[in-house]
Amino acid sequence: MANPYEQDLDRNAANHQPLTPLTYLQRAAMTYPDHVAIIHGRQRITYRDFWRRSLKLASALARHGIGKGDTVTVMLSNTPPMLEAHFGVPMTKAVLHSLNTRLDAAIIAFQLDHAETKVLIVDREFSAVVKEALALAKARPLIIDYDDPDYAADAPYPKGERIGLLDYEQFVAAGDEAFAWSMPDDEWDAISLNYTSGTTGNPKGVVYHHRGAALMAYTNTIHAGMARHAVYLWTL
């Protein structure tokens, strides 16, 4: 006998929307457009501009053929492009792979190959080790250099050389803020790729989906007791 609770109750656009953190930034940009979202050195970026820049990054990536199933890798410290990548990359349905900035060249090369990296965004702070890794890797991604304007002049390590053909700010500037970004087809679609430490062998890839990322954001907000317009110091 057919179950009446399974008849004519299929999932559709009227009763279901995939969980994804992409809608969090979209709502913040609509609700608090002029509120400061990112503080980095002398920079103050509002939610409106955070959203616009993420869209432009997504647009620029899409113009270079990036889409579902592709991996975009970043080697960045706690800078605005890191945050923009967390939204701009999945807006194209691609997957974000964030490298640990303390890895050596051999492990970076392994991850670039294993992830089949198509685009690599590199902070010049880490260009030396990335250049060494690229010499070891089989992957030949599009390299985009990021030059942090707030990188301390007296930092222990000076900025490295440019190793790519494109500059991050120029790359983003060429994007279109009217880009028609895409919700995930399914909330179980991959949003990011991380790697284990590889203590018993090569690092293992760990895939996160949109639903998991969205729920983790809820959990972190509740666990940290973050009130309205709380300012969070990102140190990890």
What are these regions, as identified by a protein language model?
Residues 16-17, 24-26, 34-79, 83-87, ...:
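Conserved AMP-binding/adenylate-forming core of the ANL superfamily
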Residues 63-64, 91-170:
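Structural core segment of the AMP-binding/adenylate-forming
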Residues 20, 24-25, 107, 129, ...:
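Hydrophobic alpha-helical segments typical of transmembrane helices
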Residues 33, 144-145, 160-195, 202, ...:
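Conserved pre-ATP/AMP-binding loop-to-beta segment of ANL
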Residues 72, 89, 120, 190, ...:
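Conserved S/T- and glycine-rich ATP-binding loop of Class I adenylate-forming
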Residues 1-18:
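Flexible, non-catalytic linker and terminal segments flanking ANL/adenylate-forming cores
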Residues 51-59, 172-178, 192, 206-228, ...:
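Conserved structural elements of the adenylate-forming
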Residues 76-79, 100, 226, 232, ...:
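Conserved AMP-binding
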